[in-house]
UniProtKB/Swiss-Prot annotation:
Component of a cohesin-like complex composed of ScpA, ScpB and the Smc homodimer, in which ScpA and ScpB bind to the head domain of Smc. The presence of the three proteins is required for the association of the complex with DNA. Its main location: cytoplasm. It comes from Malacoplasma penetrans (strain HF-2) (Mycoplasma penetrans). Keywords: Cell cycle, Cell division, Chromosome partition, Cytoplasm. This is Segregation and condensation protein A. It is found in: Cytoplasm.
Amino acid sequence: MNDNNNNNEFKPENLESLNNTEFHISIKDITGKEFNGPFELFYSLIKERKMDILNINLVEVIQLYVDYINNYLTKLKIDDLTEYLLMATYLLEQKSKRILPSMDTEEKISKDIERDKYIQRLLVYKQYQEIVPKLMEKLERRSRMFEKPTQSGEDKESLLKEFQDNSYVPAMDLDVILKAMQKVYLKLVTTKKTKSPKDNVKLIDVSEISIDDVEKEIREFLEPFPHLYKISFMDYFKNIPDEKFTKRYFVVAFVAILVLVRNGHIQLEQNSSDENIFIVKIDKEVESNEY
């Protein structure tokens, strides 16, 4: 019985899982706004009131969240409110703990740890929201330098919204990931050019390669391997066919990797001893059984 209860328990470290692409609840019809996960709603309530995240009053924000749920979400015809209500239940529990006086030093420390987890998560989310426009601007600038850009204006807006609607951000700086891919490209491009004369290569129109295509390629490559299998950027991309090997392909691959990280299909790791970045396969079924 205890094991089942533990599996259903909502924890701050699991917040990112509530904003994945498999769970989209739109409340735009009633409020004029749209939230695709409870943590995004939680963060928006803080941002709209211009609260200082480092000095946030969790009791106040929790009440705002619960009030919002009562005022709007219960009026909608939505089949699945589990994640929103689960978080509301957890937040109410945290609120009651903070309101009730505590004489136990250990309990007070536990409350502080919980609060620190929320603050850390909110700071990461805030940083991600601020860096997304810069990231997209950088990608557009690089695309203009490479082959003819494939993304229409609507596609770019859709991609931007897709990133903004999710709270997850890779543990390492996005510039670090991009620079690592650039180094891999520069190292491999010479080898591939000397190995196969261009005249003998049937070129693929990379303007037709989408982010979804590259996502699928990566997932199909990782499919036979077990949970937490890892492969370096270098080892993965050296298997890319010569006819696809272009700068434009790497730009698309960069975004595809971020999307896969965001959706929880892979993680990225970097060795402290060098600049190699590894793609780590995440098997969600195996991972869920570990909690």
